[in-house]
Curated annotation (Swiss-Prot):
Positions of S-diacylglycerol cysteine lipidation: C21
Membrane topology: Lipid-anchor
Name of the molecule in the record: Uncharacterized lipoprotein TP_0456
Organism of this sequence: Treponema pallidum (strain Nichols)
Keywords from the UniProt entry: Cell membrane, Lipoprotein, Membrane, Palmitate, Signal
Annotated GO CC locations: plasma membrane
Domain of life of the native organism: Bacteria
Signal peptide: 1-20
Subcellular locations according to the entry: Cell membrane
Species classification: Bacteria, Pseudomonadati, Spirochaetota, Spirochaetia, Spirochaetales
Lipid addition sites, N-palmitoyl cysteine: C21
Amino acid sequence: MNTRLALVLCAVGSGVLSFSCARTAEPTPAASTHVPVTTAGALSVTPPSSTDRWYQFSRTDGRVHLRACPAPSQPSAPEHFVPWTEAVRLSAVDAQQELLLINRAGVLPATQLARMQTAPVPRKAPSTPAAETTSLTLTPPALLATQSAEGFYSEPIPNSSPHPCQGTGAVFVRLYTDPLFTTSPQDSAAPFLVRYDVRTARWTSVAYTRALGLPRNAQCTALTHTRGTWYASFKSSEAERVSFAYFSFPSLSSLENLGPTQRREHPIGGKVQVPRPISAAAFRAACTPQRLHLPTASTSSDHHSDLHELLVHRLLARVPLSPLYLSARSPCWASDRSFLKTAHRTADERAHHANALIFHPPRARLSAALLTDSGHLYFVREDGSEGHARLSALPPQFVYTSFTLSGPSLIAGWEEQDFFQVGSTGLLCTEVESLTGT
């Protein structure tokens, strides 16, 4: 999930990205234990990291490898850091269809990690290529090899559908190139939105910036769906001038109808549906993260969506961190939703980030879960009870990112961060039951 939307909102109206909103990690204690907490507040400590399996990404000869490794413990050498847009890292998850979006690599089905779970944990970093049972290799599709992949999206399923929260077998992915960071030639003909077919693993182009009448080097920096409408922002660089453009549109298919070049308007259902330019203020009003509050289930006709938003606010209320930027996803939502928890703060307090997932139907007996960048897991069980656990602590400058559940496992991304650069990255797989006691 993309918590970097906060960076985009910092740029709205100014034309310059401010990294003052960049993600920073909460200091973490040295302890490395899983500590489930019941609603009554009683603690029960489980064996330290007994079910953890750590994996690290690497890239050689155009391929991406995921290999079993020991838990992160040492900082990377400075030359190993790259801008976050260029790093091989967990970028987003589709919890409903159990998909992991790996930047610069493609889509990794979470179920593929299952065959690696029984392999012995290495005592030290391997000096030779890992055995087949402890590694996976991904060959990036051409569309993703030179662009950053940011976020899973889907067309909203009508609430009248018998299964309004089920996956459709296809997902959309936003592509982005930052000319300040990339070492690859910028392809002005590349799409900014592509479709991935889960059944066939095929990628197809969907939408192009040229079709919107934007400069050839325009890049889609944000895409979100809220209150029945899609919103997108685009950044263009010309000489030393940076400009932004904003659009709203009713559906992703309205982008697809435009094709790679500008076409005539296409009527859909008797109405013309095309992207329309909007102001920076309109984009900001629609996409600024929601502040913590408790909405009622009658605020819209989408009953499932409202109940799921209530679960998000319930989890947010339990997190003793502020300010906290949260990126949340429900299978009933077409894109991630952003939330902001604020309180009185001092000048030296830092922003924290978290990701939350709603499971519909429940997964591993959980209805919802929230993971902070420091590894605190807050969850709501299917019986309505709440709990809190702690993933293994990471060294300084390492943080947890997106996560999902697959079978008996919780899979969380981890990465080493230094300002806008990223060092080591990988995945942690651990048993859900050891965390939640379910």
